[in-house]
Amino acid sequence: MTKRCSWVKMTNQLYIAYHDEEWGQPLHDDQALFELLCMETYQAGLSWETVLNKRQAFREAFHGYQIQAVAEMTDTELENLLENPAIIRNRAKIFATRANAQAFLRLQEEYGSFDAYLWSFVEGKTIVNDVPDYRQAPAKTSLSEKLAKDLKKRGFKFTGPVAVLSFLQAAGLVDDHENDCEWKNSN
C-alpha cells in the first residue's frame, strides 16, 4: 500500500492528487507559483481542503491566474467576485490577489522572474527537513519569517510566515514530507 504523509485526506481525490502530483515538487513556472501563492493566501483561517475544492472556480474568477490580467482587474470586477458563491468571498483576500499580482510583476521586473527571486532564498536547492510526524513540524521557520518580511516590504498581502512556509513546502523549496512518505526526498 502506498505510504503518504498522514495529513492527506484519503477521502478526497483532489487532496490525494495534490499531494502525489504537486505538493513538494520543485516549481519554477512563474504563473504556477503565482497561483500557488494565491491559494495559500486564501487558506488563511480556513482548511486547505476548502481551498482545493474551490481551486477551479478561483482559476475561472482570476483569468487562469494570468498575472498581468489579474494585476489589471478593476475594483468593480473584484467587487463582483464577492457575489460568486463558488469562491471564498472574503473582500480582503480578493483584493489582495490583485495587489499580489502587481507586486509579483515588480519582482519579475527586478529579478527577471519570480522564480529567480524565490529560489535565491534557498540557494537554488530544496531544503530537506526531518519530519517524523507533521503534527510536530513547526508552523513557521526563520526562512519563512525572512521571506514573509521581504514580501511584505514589497507590497504582498496575506503572506505571513505561516502562509509563506506552507507556500515554500508546496512549491518544493522545502521538503517537509513525513520521513516514511514515499514522496520524501523524491526530487
Identify what each model region corresponds to.
Residues 1-187:
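HhH-family (HhH-GPD) DNA N-glycosylase catalytic core used in base-excision repair
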